[in-house]
Design a protein with these regions (language model features):
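Nucleotidyltransferase catalytic core that binds NTPs
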Residues: 1-182
Length: 182
């Protein structure tokens, strides 16, 4: 998906940043932030425009990582960059009104919304967005990941062959570090 988005939108660089603590996902991640960042680093090897980032590292006192804070930081850090895009799955974007400061989120960056299994991009039409906000939303068909992260974790936990779902080096890391019940 990352390659398709980078090529389609002619992105110079793509930051890939795991989130330490997502406020809308109770229970948190099933692997540590350090392990998830290490897997992102593995995925970025050999991809000139991909850059792993720890910008959503754990906060002081385990406070949640809010997207608005991350995007404000990026907007300030890359103030000379006219276009900044955030890439999100349709399932998450449809929940945008539950996020902190949703109207500001739609104003400070552009959003590339990719289809996800069970979430048609046509559902974006039902979102209560102004024309100005809609101008910052770019639905992208045809990059649906055939499997979700939950399905990958289940596959690993059940001991099934996941080699077609997960790159070899990432799968090796998962096994070496006994992640996801492997």
């Amino acid at each position: 998906m990352a390659r398709t988005v980078t090529a389609t939108f002619r992105l110079d660089r793509l930051l890939l940043a795991p989130t330490a603590q997502q406020p809308l996902k109770p229970g948190g991640a099933t692997a540590s932030f350090q392990d998830r960042l290490a897997m992102v680093e593995i995925l970025c090897r050999g991809e000139a425009r991909f850059e792993p980032s720890a910008l959503d590292a754990p906060r002081i006192h385990n406070e949640p990582n809010y997207t608005i804070d991350t995007l404000r930081y990026l907007r300030a850090e890359f103030s000379d960059t006219p276009e900044i895009y955030s890439i999100v799955g349709a399932d998450s974007f449809l929940d945008l009104r539950r996020w902190r400061s949703p109207d500001q989120l739609l104003a400070i960056v552009n959003w590339i919304v990719v289809s996800r299994p069970g979430f048609a991009l046509s559902a974006l039409n039902k979102l209560d967005l102004t024309p100005e906000q809609r101008a910052h939303v770019y639905p992208l068909e045809g990059v649906t990941e055939p499997v979700s992260a939950t399905e990958v974790r289940d596959c690993l936990r059940e001991g099934r062959d996941c080699s077609e779902l997960v790159p070899y080096d990432v799968l090796s890391y998962i096994r070496e570090h006994h992640l996801y019940g492997v």
